[in-house]
Regions:
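A generic structural signal for short hydrophobic patches within well-formed alpha-helices
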Residues: 23-24, 53, 135-136
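Active-site neighborhoods of divalent-metal-dependent phosphate/nucleic-acid chemistry enzymes
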Residues: 2-3, 82-127
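Short, well-structured N-terminal submotif of metal-dependent ribonuclease cores
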Residues: 1-48, 61-74
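Short active-site oxyanion
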Residues: 13, 42-46, 80-82, 122-127
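Acidic, PIN/NYN-like endoribonuclease modules and their adjacent C-terminal/linker elements
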Residues: 1-11, 118, 122-165
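Active-site-proximal, substrate-binding regions of enzyme catalytic domains
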Residues: 55-92, 96-97, 105
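Short beta-strand scaffold positions
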Residues: 18, 47-48, 85, 112, ...
């Protein structure tokens, strides 16, 4: 885990990277959807790799036809998610992630879509919003964990964060 965020619990994040999995969770109405909607609002700035946007666009077109991208774009605008273009530093972080956490190299088994999010989180030194068992097996800080969310056995947030309220 990133030493800047290790074991740090906060009420709000200065910034975070968003993987495709929380957005898919929200649109599919999974049990984790409410937790992700709530948590995304607790970050001052949200970022997404252009590669992740392409991945989501393919998913949305496949599930909802070409009109699906309009729903996706509206969601990104509503949550003010900034799209970051791919650059050489991200490629280098992605290569590192693939060699150390990619399919066939580590139980994390990051796929290409995961690696776009991994690379951006590494480049920006920010935690990552994600769902699933892949990213917890990497050196990326978990944004949901930082916000004190609990998880089920598949690393889906399922309990509202602990609060003093």
């Amino acid at each position: 885990m990133s030493s800047a965020y290790q074991n740090k619990m906060v009420n709000f994040l200065d910034g975070a990277v968003v993987d495709s999995s929380p957005i898919v969770s929200i649109f599919e109405g999974r049990s984790s959807a409410k937790a992700f909607r709530q948590a995304l609002k607790k970050s001052k700035a949200l970022y997404m790799s252009a590669g992740t946007l392409m991945e989501l666009s393919i998913i949305f077109i496949g599930q909802k036809s070409a009109a699906g991208t309009q729903l996706l774009d509206e969601f990104l605008e509503k949550f003010n998610i900034h799209i970051e273009p791919l650059n050489i530093q991200m490629v280098m972080h992605g290569r590192y992630g693939c060699a150390n956490y990619g399919k066939g190299h580590n139980p994390a088994s990051l796929n290409m879509g995961d690696l776009f999010s991994y690379a951006l989180a590494k480049q920006m030194n920010l935690p990552l919003f994600f769902e699933g068992l892949d990213c917890p097996r990497t050196d990326i800080q978990d944004a949901m964990q930082m916000l004190s969310y609990a998880f089920d056995d598949k690393h889906s947030p399922n309990v509202p964060p602990l609060t003093d309220e």
